A protein has these predicted regions:
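ASCE RecA-like P-loop NTPase motor cores
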Residues: 1-466
Length: 466
């Protein structure tokens, strides 16, 4: 009956499907998967097809469907897929589950805890990578999953949400342990900040290609599109695209005359130079705003850097309206931030590069006339990223480690953020790339070909240390 009611709707929105499912007391998710059998077009998130548990991929295999995939904003698929094929177990959450677990689970969970404590005793540093997930621990986890599966079959209702979350996390961990290979790392992170040692075990996917390639192969055709799919080898290697995949660079509908791109050549935003950069960046923002008042976005690599420049600007130029992105903004707060960018508005919105306002927002015309990008967007240098860099060098060559780990993901965020400025063929705007490294040939060749980047120098009180 639910299926018949749904099929009467020619355009089945999320809200309509949910109402039908609840009216018939069935799960909206499974109803949506069932209805895919009769749909010509299915619009969904990546995980419905690319995730290890994605039902659309399973239905494609089961029904031998001849499907076509259209993957929008495909530059995001690398990080999304890494998340799909990564599993974590946190010791603090595990101990909380032990305290509330039913009696049948006491012994299996104690076995896990015993092996976990041994791993902690063996680890001498805060972060360590291991060749593989330890067999004894994985076997204990598999036994616990089996016991918990039986328990949930016999008693499907009344179980604590913490127990159910552990069940799903443990199942994924076991599945990824079985599929473990060079595409992933097994690492243990130990946090002693709370006064007691708490560790996190992680099977961390870094190259999703082995998991994604079969899903691309199963499709009759697949088209990935994005404004930032360069360089091709980076995306082909990490996504597992077939060698014969054609790459088409579609000419931009925008012209260089629409977007005035300037790369600052005499200022560094490297961590060691940030205090020195605050006043020049604030002065640049104020000067551009005075020349052409309107709405601008200013992007920074962190909230700390953002707030430091914002403070400098407010102290020196309190007349300029400003608003800022804050940590953990909810949907209402995000919309309020965007609402400040009205066609009659004026001011500077401060945001973190790679966050909610760096892509996926549309502010055409006078709603946004410029952007300041004070960072290359490079991921933080830390033990995890350094391990990823080493693995990239082993898998794809020593000349690709830095690019695959740091440079390409960073510049992807830069180009996406700059892309907020020009949204229609009638728009005009300006982008300032604030860092001397934007003038390096290796960086320039990764920027959009339709940009005409001009080199500029800021007036400084003294020569910076570069």
């Amino acid at each position: 009956a639910a299926r018949a009611a749904a099929l009467e709707q020619r355009w089945l929105t999320h809200e309509a499907l949910r109402e039908i499912a609840l009216a018939h007391q069935i799960c909206p998710y499974y109803l949506s998967q069932e209805l895919c059998r009769w749909a010509d077009v299915v619009v969904c998130d990546y995980n419905y097809y690319f995730d290890m548990g994605g039902l659309l991929y399973g239905l494609t295999l089961l029904n031998e469907w001849r499907i076509t995939l259209l993957v929008d904003e495909a530059h995001n698929l690398i990080e999304r897929a890494r998340g799909m094929y990564t599993a974590e177990l946190n010791q603090q959450r595990f101990e909380a589950v032990r305290r509330i677990a039913p009696s049948v689970m006491k012994a299996p969970l104690e076995r896990i805890s015993r092996h976990w404590r041994q791993l902690e005793r063996d680890q001498e540093v805060a972060y360590q990578v291991y060749p593989t997930a330890p067999d004894l621990f994985v076997m204990a986890l598999q036994k616990a999953v089996s016991t918990l599966t039986d328990h949930l079959s016999e008693q499907p209702a009344g179980n604590a949400s913490e127990l159910l979350h552990f069940y799903l996390d443990a199942m994924l961990f076991c599945r990824l342990a079985e599929a473990f290979g060079a595409h992933s790392l097994f690492d243990i992170s130990r946090d002693e900040g709370s006064g007691q040692s708490v560790s996190t075990l992680c099977i961390r996917n870094i190259v999703p290609a082995p998991f994604l390639a079969p899903r691309f192969d199963e499709a009759h055709s697949c088209t990935l599109f994005s404004a930032t799919l360069s360089p091709a080898n980076y995306y082909a290697d990490l996504l597992g695209l077939p060698e014969e995949t054609p790459w088409i660079d579609v000419e931009s509908p925008f012209s260089a005359e629409q977007l005035h791109v300037q790369a600052v050549s005499n200022l560094s935003t490297r961590y060691a130079h940030r205090d020195y950069s605050l006043a020049p960046i604030a002065a640049l923002i104020a000067r551009q705003y005075a020349e052409k008042p309107g709405n601008y976005l200013a992007f920074f690599s962190s909230y700390t850097y953002l707030q430091a420049v914002l403070h400098e600007l407010q102290m020196a130029h309190p007349q300029i309206p400003v608003w800022q992105q804050s940590r953990k903004m909810d949907e209402v707060e995000r919309q309020a931030f965007l609402d400040r960018f009205s066609s009659t508005g004026r001011g500077i919105g401060f945001a973190v590069l790679g966050g909610a306002f760096g892509e996926g927002i549309d502010l055409p015309g006078d709603r946004l006339i410029g952007a300041f990008i004070a960072t290359l967007g490079l991921p933080q240098i830390n033990p995890v990223n350094e391990e990823i860099k080493q693995r990239m060098e082993v898998m794809f060559g020593s000349n690709n480690g830095y690019g695959y780990t740091y440079l390409y993901p960073g510049l992807q965020k830069v180009v996406q953020a700059a892309g907020r400025v020009i949204r229609t063929v009638k728009d005009q705007g300006v982008v300032y790339l604030i860092d001397d490294r934007f003038n390096q040939p290796a960086i320039r060749k990764l920027l959009p070909t339709w940009w005409k980047v001009e080199r500029c120098r800021l007036p400084l009180n003294k020569d910076p240390v570069l």
